[in-house]
Regions:
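Conserved N-terminal phosphate-binding loop of PLP-dependent enzymes in the Aspartate aminotransferase
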Residues: 1-453
């Protein structure tokens, strides 16, 4: 039996272990509280495993089905071709709680990057078939419009889309030269000057997209965007901009893909972030909180025959998603519904944002651009070094937060977070900023920054 004190030593024999310098106690961690198995110390977790844990640690309802989950671990079926009642119960629950009525098609796979990857393949297939039907021999349709500071994964196609602050994610890997557009992100508070500036950027972005469509037209299969960019810096967009993208996609017969791997399943105070903007995507990639990943498609896919949801083996994988993840997701979705956790995210998110705005007023030299929808909140530090020092200081005071973009700190509480826990987090942050000791912290390969996904 490996002891908690030896975990990193054992792992580091073969793996990089530059993540958090704590060992997760899978039994004693509870709700929003991460327990270090080495010391028994509790950390208030406001990163939630990169926004992948919806209902916290050891939710009582999940503990009730622990034996069932263990039973499922004995055999791992190939869900793509071998079916079970457990999978059927999952799909039935997913349809009822998570699937927008306008999106009847769904595909499951393991990993958010592969969710995006298969959304792209769906778009390529759709566009090429459309071009072939209009002009035999015209098999163009192999490019994707995307945005600066986007994070869509680290797999084959997605490497050509991802371009966040950390170049190590994509450097030296072969990539396609697909059109990359400026991201007209909002700066808060959204006063007159900031609104004028973002409209200028929106016009520049839309102009660039129009130019790409004029030059490459038939070869553009899709446009992809995160409704709120996460890893790239918690970058928000105006509804009017996303609506303009929808109109462009309709006008030029390309598919609009929303990557909701991070924004989905209640984090923003709506089940899906796109619901805030009165914009309906053609394809939607999901993951993280759903445990099993995948993508959904609207009826626009049905404009062609033999699309990827009709023709066998066009998109597939051995496992078609992990059955244990599916069953866990079944119960998580029911918990979210019955405990009204999307509404909790909206209410507590409003409190969290208000507290961040107070921080900006009290510490204007440290906190700017406080922003958020629901619990997906962030603020900017003066520079990346100060950001890293603050994150390390918060960690030392038992608060787990991670960075994003070049100098932002992101908040990703569990959907079950309480007002009291938000107040505790703010007390820690205020104490660190008041004392100012963070300026003496050395930042090298810091194990607590967690700028990973």
């Amino acid at each position: 039996m490996i002891q908690p004190q030896n975990v990193k030593q054992v792992l580091s024999r073969h793996l990089l272990t530059e993540g958090f310098d704590i060992i997760l106690d899978l039994d004693r961690s509870q709700g929003s509280w991460f327990v270090d198995e080495r010391t028994g110390e509790r950390y208030l977790d406001f990163f939630s495993m990169y926004a992948s844990m919806a209902v916290g640690y050891n939710h009582p309802r999940l503990l009730q089905v622990r034996d069932r989950l263990g039973q499922l671990a004995v055999n791992k079926p190939s869900n793509s071709d071998v079916y079970t009642t457990a999978m059927a119960e999952f799909v039935d629950t997913f349809e009822r709680i998570a699937m927008p009525p306008e999106m009847p098609h769904v595909f499951f796979i393991e990993g958010g990057a592969l969710a995006v990857e298969n959304a792209l393949k769906t778009a390529f297939d759709w566009k090429v078939r459309k071009n072939l039907a209009a002009q035999p021999g015209n098999d163009s349709g192999s490019q994707v419009i995307h945005f600066r500071q986007a994070f869509h994964g680290r797999s084959g196609y997605t490497l050509s889309l991802t371009n966040t602050f950390d170049p190590r994610k994509t450097r030296f890997f072969p990539k396609f030269d697909w059109p990359r557009i400026i991201n007209p992100k909002l700066t808060f508070p959204l006063d007159t000057d900031n609104l004028v500036q973002v409209r200028i950027l929106e016009n520049e972005a839309l102009g660039s997209i129009n130019q790409v469509l004029e030059e490459r037209g038939e070869d553009i299969a899709a446009l992809i965007i995160e409704p709120i960019q996460g890893e790239g810096g918690d970058n928000h967009f105006r509804a009017e901009f996303l609506q303009a993208l929808r109109q462009l996609c309709d006008r030029h017969d390309i598919l609009l893909i929303f990557d909701e791997v991070q924004t989905g399943v209640g984090l923003t105070g709506k089940f899906w972030a796109f619901e805030h903007f009165d914009v309906q995507p053609d394809l939607l990639a999901f993951g993280k909180k759903t445990q099993v990943c995948g993508m959904m498609a609207s009826r626009r896919i049905d404009e062609i025959c033999c699309h990827v949801f009709q023709e066998r083996s066009r998109i597939n994988s051995t496992f078609g998603g992990n059955l244990i993840d599916m069953v866990r997701c079944t119960h998580i979705l029911r918990i979210i519904e019955e405990e009204q956790l999307v509404e909790n995210a909206r209410v507590q998110g409003a409190l969290l944002l208000a507290e961040l705005q107070k921080l900006a007023a009290e510490f204007p030299h440290l906190v700017t651009n406080p922003r958020g929808r629901g619990l997906m909140c962030a603020f900017d530090a003066p520079d990346s070094h100060t950001r890293d020092q603050l994150v390390k200081a918060f960690f030392q005071q038992k608060l787990l937060l991670v960075g994003c973009g070049s100098r932002s700190i992101r908040f990703r509480p569990h959907l079950i977070v309480t007002a009291g826990e938000i107040e505790q987090a703010m007390d820690i942050i205020c104490d660190v900023m008041h004392k100012g000791d963070y300026v003496h912290l050395e930042i090298t390969k810091d194990p607590c920054l967690g700028i990973g996904t």
